[in-house]
Every structure is written in structure tokens, then in C-alpha cells.
Amino acid sequence: VRDAYIAQNYNCVYTCFKNDYCND
């Protein structure tokens, strides 16, 4: 669960950077 959370969080940050937006 913890690893999944980290992976999901990293993916969110990557998407944020890629799309040049961030909501969190």
C-alpha cells in the first residue's frame, strides 16, 4: 500500500510537471 501510494504520488507530480499545472 505504501509503495503504491508513493508510486501514485510520483505519477501525480510527473503529470503536474508535464502538464504544467498542480492542484495539491
Curated annotation (Swiss-Prot):
Its main location: secreted. Disulfide bonds: none annotated. Residues 2-24 form the LCN-type CS-alpha/beta domain. InterPro entries: LCN-type_CS_alpha_beta_dom, Scorpion_toxin-like_sf, Scorpion_toxinL/defensin. It is found in: Secreted. It comes from the Eukaryota. Gene3D superfamilies: Knottin, scorpion toxin-like. Expressed by the venom gland. Pfam families: Toxin_3 (PF00537). GO terms for cellular component: extracellular region. Keywords: Ion channel impairing toxin, Neurotoxin, Secreted, Toxin, Voltage-gated sodium channel impairing toxin. GO terms for molecular function: sodium channel inhibitor activity; toxin activity. Binds to sodium channels (Nav) and inhibits the inactivation of the activated channels, thereby blocking neuronal transmission. Belongs to the long (4 C-C) scorpion toxin superfamily. Sodium channel inhibitor family. Alpha subfamily. Has the structural arrangement of an alpha-helix connected to antiparallel beta-sheets by disulfide bonds (CS-alpha/beta). This is Neurotoxin 5. It comes from Buthus occitanus tunetanus.
